């Protein structure tokens, strides 16, 4: 006989003492819907008066069957009976709203709680809800008003800022955490190191590393990998190698991070050597390893090695290629001018090629003036972001199809797609200075432009000729040259020269890929100034020294040198 039948046939006095037990039995038998039905029957056929334990069971049932509407009804009952100050009830109710992305209802529940509860647990739940949706501003409003903040609160905000690319905010929050008197843990350090890596904040990253040693936090494989990644992305690849080599037992993720770091610096031969060490040590590579290996091959023009790795991952390690493996392989072939082979690989892929793969092929079509294949490739890309429109416009302008290029910009404007502005930045004295093309907003603008004009003059005396063919607008030669002269990375270099002494290494970060003109200019300037200039663009690092680049000019043209750190 079911509990519902019992309720209908037996007097209330026989059922009432066992009401919660009946409900709990339904839950334990894996029938949360039945629990809700039994409760409804009790309310309908008896004068049963639920207590806080009843509501705890009801909320557990709502959680198990994801019934948000029943949750809202229970919330209403709780308000009427005055149980919204019970800790055992408020937490599951809040979590139910957050799990179902009902943050408005969660806020209505949370704000009154601040009058009687200082427990950071509930605030941390709210932070989790907003950060899950990427709403850092709303999470910060919760964070500011939390009466008590524990380490979970700070870690949530720092990690959320990193995930939403608010890197300066992440570093500021970490500094505030340190000043609050709480001791950062491994999660705190790994999050802020990720922010330093992505922002290229070398000075801040070094301070964080020193603080790790002072605090005495245990350096597990996640923290070691974070340190390797941070130093590499801040232009200190030799320090990354030093940290990597200091670890006796290396986790797979640490090997992968080191290989990826070397790949980002274009150190192809070092990548090959490190992978051999990895195999000899008995560590079995995974799919991430081979993405890094193939990326290194793409950066360094190592076509044969790429073919070998692509074959080895399936034949030796039984790793099925994913779209990112195909993408790296297509990029390797495309950059080497093997467009037909790259296209054939795309057409034979076991998975559907994504837009990234088609863009790699399309970019190579522009570089090698393969307009027919370019037209075929264009049809496969539905322009989504500004990068797609820019690439398509550049292809047309490179073959003097100015009308078609202009049509692309008109279409972009019509669809209200905003072009991503190129930004470059440098970190000096612990503070970051950001520049955009033609930027005049800096307090030292007059001095920066004076230095830049001087550098341009010296570069031309050494043979630099502006690559005006790279300007994608049909304008005069003078306008083209002026357009190239004040690119953001040139301004960043001029600022660094202005603010640092002779011989000081210069590190410039850029959110887009550097243009060929700035690449050639920096080669010459490194020779003129007798300085090392390291430029980190969207794809990789370029180390300019004595008139040469570590990419061997492969990323732009051909020829050059390679250095090693292993």
Feature-to-residue mapping (PLM):
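Short glycine- and Lys/Arg-enriched binding-loop motifs that mark or flank ligand-binding interfaces
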Residues: 156
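Terminal (and in a subset, N-terminal) low-complexity or junction segments at the ends
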Residues: 1-150, 159-566
